[in-house]
A protein has these predicted regions:
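N-terminal active-site segment of His-dependent metallophosphoesterases
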Residues: 1-44, 176, 343
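Cys-nucleophile CN-hydrolase/nitrilase-fold catalytic domain and related Cys-dependent amidase chemistry
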Residues: 24, 32-116, 181-205, 209-212
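CN hydrolase (nitrilase-like) catalytic-core segments centered on the catalytic cysteine
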Residues: 68-87, 155-252
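Short beta-strand scaffold segments in enzyme catalytic cores
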Residues: 87-89, 99-104, 141, 232-234, ...
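Active-site catalytic loop in hydrolytic enzyme cores
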Residues: 93-202, 268-271
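C-terminal beta-strand edge segments of enzyme domains
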Residues: 212-319
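ATP/NTP-dependent adenylation/nucleotidyl-transfer catalytic domains that generate, transfer
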Residues: 279-363, 373-601
Length: 601
């Protein structure tokens, strides 16, 4: 982007891409088609992080990693008037594995690698365990292209301020960021997940601070329920947004980068020049922060002084802020329901059709709000002709439940069927277990319903779709190997109160939403009777516990002690119900311990 007086604007294309998991050749072909379609109108095309394979490969990284030379061979010959291309991929380099991005130029009828950046900051929190499967890069450098000096970072590299500063100090006027950012935390009225809002803050801040362009190409699609959201962005050197990609869909987002705006922005806000001037002093300060420097510093606090600081609450446990945590957590449970609906519809469509290769699903319809919401979402995602709703009543099932199940089946126009489970249950009880307890009998009914759903799914070449919510899962309030058995569950990360809100948003009949929640396994018994606390009370407590608050902090923050204790005990006592069966590890290839592959591999 040098010689801005004579150079026309740089035309960039940010590709939101859904790779086929671990199918490198198929993904290269899709990349080639996209390049060919944009070759006459684009100067630079950017594909997301791990475009060759998908992001979550676990131990499969080694099987999908290629060298840069192998990638160039797979890419074949570039089209006429080819743009430059950036591709994110798992790289094999010097017998090691990296999460990398390569900048390719078309020269003399073939692709040439101008630069490779290897991701430095590898996330190892939450669902991420990247450092287990690849090694971190150790270098960040700006490089020359026919469009001027460019720098590349990958995803979390961008969340740290120093790499972008180093590239800008190295002369980069354009920062290219392939990314695979998971959607999470859907706050109301945001229109985007909270992590995408954070992306916009980071990129705008880096662009404005350094007077550079920043472009981010985001992966899109569901990988085993982990949703890449899209939302690619291009930001100008004044921090303004030049382009935004759509959410949850493949797309090519175009932006025009006028190099002249760099000079104008740096004149208006000469922050990069200030940084260059202060850099030697900052380097000396940085050197003084080395771990051993504190020990050499005569002004370092003595041990008893450090203890006094801890006592003042600057480090360690301090008083809980004077806030009502119940109000805070209840507010945190509010959702952007339009965005959640769109996300879950795309999740069902992506996981059932693209990842698993099915067209249809079966849903057990109880007449309760959870199954009503799952059924409605499935019909929106797949069409009602591809959704089979099964009523599976026992003779003591309430007439109200049957009527409500019929109501939602009629509303959604799903394919409806009723199968009575009374005879097989009663026969087993009469012949073998005449003294069976109500709890065991309820579990027996739940497991038989699951068996029937799986058998019907085999008959219909369909997948069972789950209906269990997050509150039930965290409280252990479900029948093991029954409610939790469907392979796909759109509601599993929604608290019960959030399901109620989503149900209202979807237009589920009020009579279903407002009735007391019940598993309808024991006549007249509600969820609250069995759990011992209402969902409205339990959900904010659960949110606090899984967010890292202790029982004591929640009680001091305003929650009722007996309810916090009850919810905490149920959470702690039921971890086993949320895990796969425990296997004795006897080898270095134990499945799920050493041999790791994602569910959609």
């Amino acid at each position: 982007m040098s010689n801005s007086e004579v150079r026309p604007p740089l035309r960039v294309a940010l590709v939101q891409f859904k790779p086929t998991k671990a199918e490198v050749s198929a993904n290269v072909e899709a990349i080639q088609r996209t390049i060919a379609s944009q070759s006459s109108s684009t100067d630079l095309i950017v594909f997301p992080e791990t475009s060759l394979s998908g992001y979550f490969l676990e131990g499969g990284v080694a099987e999908s990693a290629v060298t840069t030379e192998e990638l160039i061979g797979l890419m074949g010959s570039p089209p006429d008037r080819s743009p430059d291309v950036v591709i994110g991929f798992y790289e094999r380099w010097r017998r090691r594995l990296y999460n990398s991005a390569v900048y390719l130029e078309a020269r003399e009828g073939r692709w040439k690698a101008r630069h490779v950046h290897r991701k430095m900051f590898l996330p190892t929190y939450g669902v991420f365990d990247e450092a287990r499967f690849v090694e971190p890069g150790t270098d960040v450098q700006a490089f020359e292209t026919r469009f001027g000096r460019i720098g590349m970072l990958i995803c979390e590299d961008m969340w740290h301020s120093l790499p972008a500063s180093i590239l800008a100090l190295g002369g980069a006027e354009l920062l290219v960021v392939p990314s695979a950012s998971l959607a999470r935390d859907f706050s109301p009225a945001g229109g985007r997940s909270r992590n995408l809002e954070r992306w916009e803050q980071i990129t705008a801040g880096a662009a404005l601070e350094h007077g550079i362009f920043v472009i981010v190409a985001q992966l899109v699609g569901s990988e085993g329920g982990k949703l890449f959201f899209g939302g690619s962005i291009a930001v100008g050197p004044d921090g303004s947004f030049l382009a935004r990609g759509p959410l949850l869909e493949e797309a090519v987002t175009l932006a025009s980068l006028d190099a002249g705006s760099i000079n104008r922005s740096r004149m208006a806000s000469p922050l990069l020049a200030d940084l260059e001037q202060m850099l030697p002093h900052l380097q000396r300060s940085l050197e003084s922060t080395r771990p051993h420097a504190v020990l050499e510093d005569s002004h370092a606090p003595l041990e008893n002084e450090a203890q006094e600081v801890v006592g003042e609450g600057l480090v360690g446990e301090g008083p809980v802020p004077d806030k009502d945590l119940g109000i805070i957590h209840a507010a945190e449970l509010n959702l952007d329901l339009d965005l959640v609906e769109k996300t879950l519809i795309e999740f069902i469509r992506d996981e059932v059709r693209r990842r698993r290769g099915f067209e249809r699903v079966v849903v057990g319809v109880s007449g309760g709000v959870d199954s009503a919401v799952s059924l409605a979402l499935a019909c929106k995602a797949l069409g009602p002709e591809n959704v089979y709703g099964f009523r599976l009543p026992y003779r003591t099932s309430s007439q109200e439940s049957l009527e409500h199940a019929a109501l939602i089946l009629d509303m959604t126009q799903a394919q409806a069927q009723t199968i009575e489970i009374s005879d097989p249950i009663d026969l087993y009880v009469k012949e073998y277990e005449p003294e069976i307890s109500p709890l065991r009998k309820g579990n027996l009914m739940a497991r038989l319903r699951s068996i029937i759903l799986f058998d019907q799914s085999a008959k219909l070449n369909a997948l069972p779709l789950g209906t269990g919510n997050k509150s039930e899962r965290l409280l252990g309030y479900f029948t093991w190997h029954a409610d939790d058995s469907p392979p796909i569950n759109p509601l599993g990360d929604l608290f019960k109160t959030q399901v109620w809100a989503l149900a209202q948003h979807l237009g589920i009949p009020e009579v279903i939403i407002e009735k007391p929640a019940t598993a309808d396994l024991v006549k007249g018994v509600t969820d609250e009777d069995e759990i011992g606390v209402s969902y409205h009370a339990a959900d904010p407590i659960l949110f606090g516990l899984v967010s890292g608050y202790s029982v004591e902090e929640l009680v001091r923050g305003g929650f009722k002690e007996d309810e916090v204790e009850l919810v905490s005990k149920r959470l702690q006592a039921t971890h086993w119900k949320r895990e796969l069966p425990t296997v004795a590890v006897l080898s270095s290839s134990a499945i799920g311990e050493f041999y790791l592959r994602p569910v959609d591999y």
